[in-house]
């Protein structure tokens, strides 16, 4: 199996290198064929691995491939840990990446950087595979940073746009903040456990109970919180969420890949993998749960006031990541991964469908300038409808099972603040349904607001775009029904996660729900279902029936609207504190260190000192030869006298 695992990781990397170095000579067709072939190989082998480990209950594979370096007793190796958790992630990442690769053929066909883009997205896939399959913290960090680096390149791919450069710089800097906490957490793991290997670390987890840092703070709590800071950056949790909406400046295919299956899911996966550590600290779990609830609720509210088609979907990603994080906080790791999986399919679908609309409308992204597109773009409309129903949790669709399980898990949690969190995630159902259906209604229903010239030439997009939409629509509908029982109730992920016996949310879920059908029959009597129905009705009311009401409410509640439009002031706050603060600090250091110390003290000061010394020596330079001869004789006598004294020589022996 080791050759299979190596092939999964290396196939996209080889494709990326070949196309990256020789794309111009290879041409467009051969370039995308090579990268798609590499990802296809990884996808097929990922399904094979899934079949071996999950369906046929194969043994966990945990083996080092080679040792990178040895420092004392510390071995830093490159290896693979492949269990059921890894297998599920491999299928999700590879399949979504393959769909994005195929979609890119149609979306980027006129772009000058066509071959370079294919090279980048294949490299992105390799980085995510490295992260998911790692068996130690160092390799995890390598994949973690590689994902961040390639996302920087892809968000700023259209570097001729100033907004794209600002967005990729923001993403890079914000993630460095999270990564700083992450690497500190890894350093503490090394300090307390003496190893970076997962298995060795987890086997010693009980030894850290009761240990403290600085005599006051629980060591395991500090470690988990620092690791979670890294997850907050990658998975865009408040307040490190500000980079994700800006990532829309990149081409739509990479928006889909980042938001669905790679970068933003890295933090969710990492916390799930670290479940043996997080289960030792209720404080850390509570923080994770509360941060997730804040993100789910307040980022969803921002989706209501967005008019850019991609940004509406982007804020839905932020909100759904909040739901996943809430599930992690209540120790429902399998539920979080379940929602990660279902979300990957329908969120990739929604982004690619948005891209289809953008291409058809000649890169128009304002939903207020759309409308009535369902007749001209039936495939895009139907797939968008299916993806939207999955996102809002309509009964029977993929998102319904995973989102409802998160809400129920919170309901059974006994952590502090779980009552408030339950309120937040239930209210989030209404908000999600509202902004999602508002988007669908404004884009595809009602009267057309498209300009006449564009409307005359409006038609469905090419098969390279619509086929991935259809392929992603299928799991967006059925994947939840077919996987909820084995994944949540049958223990698919039991060998990849650990739950302490004191945390009973998942056990209570298993006790109350036994099948997909029981969940559907139960849902119609629950508050989340009626919140979803209310969100749909409200969206229809404001988007189609009484469109003028939206403007009236905007004017009446202009302060609330201002807060939402200004994104709660996070960007403004960051600019004042960090951007301007950094400029002022840099200016101060420039004045003190550069101007005062270096220029005035060292450079000019040394010149002034030389001039001062020279003022004493200058009178000696008279220009008369006999003066110089006199000084030479005196100097020679002094030197001779010093030599005689030093050698203890006497003329009187």
Predicted regions mapped to residue ranges:
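Transmembrane helix-loop-helix hairpins at membrane boundaries of multipass inner-membrane proteins
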Residues: 1-4, 22-119, 192-217, 221, ...
